[in-house]
């Protein structure tokens, strides 16, 4: 054989492989584009119909639709469900297919970024202060659209009310009462249209939120806004009827009415009372000072939804059923995931009182650096769940995830005491029996967060933190450094960290990340600056030189049982979560159709509230039966996959971290490796002057896109957003364009 044949053959194979890969990429891109177009068309058409519905044209469209579809297999209720709730379920199914095709990880390269900086609707702050907090241009447009819709709906329904008065020739004495009740009816209808969207933002692992890459912690604010609007219209709905019945002198008689055919009043009263209790306890002051009262009262959503179905019947309840069904899907999956006990690999306490827990996770669990989890510690409470940002990067290790917890309230104080007890028991290990050894039994929901690691989309980053808000930025830095070390695609080359703390003892948080050990000679690969502002001290303490030492060394838990976090989460495996959604939806449609054919129609069931109850039962049963079946197989797949990967070649140390074997050159240079403190500037007795900070970057970074991520209190976010807005409006062509991103969690 000629010596040149092998290289030629290799070149042919390489060319063939490249051609096949290119062809596959074109097919994937085409499918994604088609799905995007189809989903966009369905969504726009659906929203336009919802906005037209209060008017006479929308009413005529619905009448024609019912005439066409009510005689089909789905019946009258099915026709309403298809036009109001069907589109959002179809979009969810298409979204699951889109995510499956897209793959697991978004890779940002220089080819994907624009040559010149440009404004983005989601990252340009328009409103920076007020009841809405920091509002981006995209959110402001959404607020405007909803505001126009409400004004239009009130105007359109008022015209229709006047036409109804003329049509029925109501007597002058009863005209005002009739108009009042008719207005109450319209307010209730607007409330139902708002409720179409109400449950979509609070589905933590929602396929829809993942599609548009809005994490749950951001979406909760939309739920809050929609909740206020929905309850306002429902309250006006109830108030109009109460005033009208009071004028008639029939308030108590009609208030407790529960008709078989038509609207059942008493269930509506119960639903409204439950809604009002949730509304009052969700106000910012109550939620901030009495969070547990807010949390437990909010469980009345079950009463609110069930009695709403009894109040309006299946026909009208089908208007809001789509969003509620997606929420039930998410809630059942969360319940199943949270039943598993998760091992605490290690725990330690820092001088500032912050606790670090390292939790076990399976190798196939995917998450991004800006993710968060909900944590329950059964020794402290069986009911309380608390959200915490993840402080570790997915590249830190395949078998663990770490969180930092600041001791602020009663729950975290109890956790600190439990860790202290555990530390003392470890020192007396020989004297304590296994049965009496203190334990920390944790359960976890999540992780949740952005679908794509958007911090990797910027070549230049400014990370602004307040206090414990530095936690997610440890994950970002670790993620970037791991990628730089391993030669993976990683855009960020310049990172400025601005961290404001009250006292210097919080500097010990820096011990949670050891930058030189992650990436040796990191300064050659990453331009990193850390500016720390200690606001309540005018000069350093004597102990500041020892800030990297911890009070208690890492505690290894002796009672681990090999249980890691469950991957049964909406943000988990795309194929399984897609199957869960699709099969549950098909099961629900099949179940409601069979009940309609073989029970409701066969036995001539006409009671509205009973049909509404059957509708809710079918929703829940379809998730439990069909969704539960998928969950069982998903769990078995997780178990088998976990066993295979557990027998892999991953090297994990006692802290759950994968070992990295440095090269000979790295080992040779360890003695002269730079210290991260050389790139850290600490200022005492002052706060960050963000205008000066941003102006200083004008000459250093030039005309580039700069991602600014803020994690901290509302005042910090407002201050940064205000400076970004001002800088962006008056910037010169050769200055950076700053993009505001918030990473603060506020239930």
UniProtKB/Swiss-Prot annotation:
Ranges where the Ferric oxidoreductase domain occurs: 187-308
Top-level EC class: oxidoreductase
Signal peptide: none
Residues that, per the record, bind FAD: 386-389
E.C. designation(s): 1.16.1.7
Transit peptide residues according to the UniProt entry: 1-28
Signals that turn on the gene: Up-regulated in shoots by iron deficiency and down-regulated in shoots by copper deficiency.
Positions that bind NAD(+): 446-449
Phenotype reported upon loss of the gene: No visible phenotype when grown under normal conditions. Reduced photosynthetic electron transport efficiency, chloroplast ferric chelate reductase activity and iron content. Seedling lethal when grown in alkaline soil.
InterPro entries associated with the record: Cyt_b245_heavy_chain, FAD-bd_8, FAD-bd_FR_type, Fe3_Rdtase_TM_dom, Fe_red_NAD-bd_6, FNR_nucleotide-bd, RBOH/FRE, Riboflavin_synthase-like_b-brl
Keyword field contains Metal-binding: yes
Cellular component terms per the entry's GO annotation: chloroplast; chloroplast membrane; plastid
Entry function: Ferric chelate reductase involved in iron mobilization from the cytosol into the chloroplast. May participate in the transport of electrons to a Fe(3+) ion via FAD and heme intermediates. Might be involved iron homeostasis in trichomes.
Name this polypeptide is given: Ferric reduction oxidase 7, chloroplastic
Phylogenetic classification of the source organism: Eukaryota, Viridiplantae, Streptophyta, Embryophyta, Tracheophyta
Gene: FRO7
């Amino acid at each position: 054989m000629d010596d040149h044949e092998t290289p030629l053959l290799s070149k042919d194979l390489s060319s063939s492989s490249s051609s096949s890969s290119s062809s596959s990429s074109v097919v994937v891109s085409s499918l994604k584009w088609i799905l995007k177009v189809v989903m966009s068309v369905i969504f726009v058409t659906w929203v336009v119909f919802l906005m037209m519905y209060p008017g006479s044209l929308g009413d005529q469209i619905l009448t024609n639709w019912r005439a066409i579809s009510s005689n089909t297999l789905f019946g009258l209720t099915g026709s309403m469900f298809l036009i109001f709730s069907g589109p959002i379920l179809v979009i969810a199914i298409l979204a699951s297919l889109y995510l499956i095709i897209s793959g697991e990880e978004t890779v940002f390269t220089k080819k994907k970024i624009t040559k010149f900086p440009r404004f983005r609707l989601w990252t340009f702050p328009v409103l920076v202060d007020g009841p809405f907090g920091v509002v981006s241009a995209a959110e402001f447009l959404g607020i405007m659209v909803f505001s126009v819709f409400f004004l239009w709906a009130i105007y359109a329904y008022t015209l229709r009310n006047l036409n109804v008065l003329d049509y029925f020739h109501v007597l002058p004495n009863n005209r005002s009462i009739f108009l009042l009740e008719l207005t109450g009816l319209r307010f209730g209808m607007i409330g139902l249209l708002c409720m179409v969207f109400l449950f979509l933002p609070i589905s933590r692992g929602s396929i829809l939120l993942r599609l548009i890459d809005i994490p749950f912690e951001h979406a909760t604010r939309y739920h809050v806004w929609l909740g206020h609007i929905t309850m306002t219209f429902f309250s006006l709905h109830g108030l109009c009827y109460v005033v009208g019945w009071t004028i008639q002198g029939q308030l108590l008689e009609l208030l407790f009415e529960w008709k078989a055919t038509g609207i059942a009043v008493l269930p509506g009263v119960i639903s409204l009372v439950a809604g009002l209790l949730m509304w009052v306890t969700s106000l910012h002051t109550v939620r901030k000072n009495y969070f547990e009262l807010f949390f437990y009262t909010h469980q009345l959503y079950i009463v609110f939804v069930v009695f709403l179905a009894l109040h309006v019947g299946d026909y009208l309840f089908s208007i809001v059923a789509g969003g509620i069904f997606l929420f039930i899907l998410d809630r059942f999956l969360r319940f199943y995931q949270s039943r598993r006990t998760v091992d605490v690999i290690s725990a330690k306490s820092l001088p500032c009182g912050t606790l670090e827990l390292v939790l076990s996770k399976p190798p196939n669990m995917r998450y991004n650096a800006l993710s968060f989890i909900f944590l329950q510690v059964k020794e402290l409470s069986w009911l309380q769940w608390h959200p915490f940002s993840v402080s570790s990067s997915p590249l830190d290790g395949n078998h663990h995830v770490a969180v930092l917890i600041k001791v602020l309230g009663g729950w975290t104080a109890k956790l600190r005491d439990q860790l202290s007890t555990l530390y003392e028991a470890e020192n007396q290990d020989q004297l304590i029996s296994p049965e009496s050894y203190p334990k920390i039994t944790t359960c976890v929901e999540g992780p949740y967060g952005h679908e794509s690691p958007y911090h990797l989309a910027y070549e230049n980053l400014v990370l602004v933190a307040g206090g414990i808000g530095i936690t997610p930025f440890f994950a970002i830095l670790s993620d970037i450094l791991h990628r730089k070390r391993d030669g993976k695609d990683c855009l960020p080359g310049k990172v400025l960290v601005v961290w404001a703390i009250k006292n210097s003892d919080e500097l010990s948080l820096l011990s949670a990340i050891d930058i030189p050990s992650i990436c040796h000679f990191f300064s050659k690969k990453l331009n990193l600056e850390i500016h720390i502002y200690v606001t309540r001290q005018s000069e350093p303490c004597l102990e500041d030189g020892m800030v990297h030492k911890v009070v208690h060394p890492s505690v290894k838990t002796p009672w681990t049982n090999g249980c890691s976090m469950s991957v049964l989460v909406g943000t988990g495996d795309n194929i399984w979560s897609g199957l869960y959604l699709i099969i549950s939806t098909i099961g629900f449609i099949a179940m409601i159709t069979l009940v309609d054919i073989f029970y409701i129609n066969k036995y001539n069931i006409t009671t509205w509230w009973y049909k509404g109850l059957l509708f809710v039962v079918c929703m829940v049963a379809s998730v439990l039966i069909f969704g539960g079946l998928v969950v069982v197989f998903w769990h078995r797949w997780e178990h088998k996959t976990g066993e295979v990967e557990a027998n892999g070649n991953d090297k994990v140390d006692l802290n759950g971290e994968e070992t990295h074997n440095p090269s000979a050159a790295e080992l040779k240079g360890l003695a002269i490796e730079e210290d991260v403190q050389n790139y850290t500037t600490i200022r005492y007795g002052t706060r960050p002057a963000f205008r000066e900070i941003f102006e200083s970057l004008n000459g250093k970074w030039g005309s580039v896109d700069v991602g600014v991520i803020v994690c901290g209190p509302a005042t910090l976010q407002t201050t940064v957003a205000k400076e970004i807005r001002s800088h962006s409006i008056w910037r010169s062509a050769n200055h950076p364009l700053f993009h505001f991103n918030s990473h603060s969690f506020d239930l």
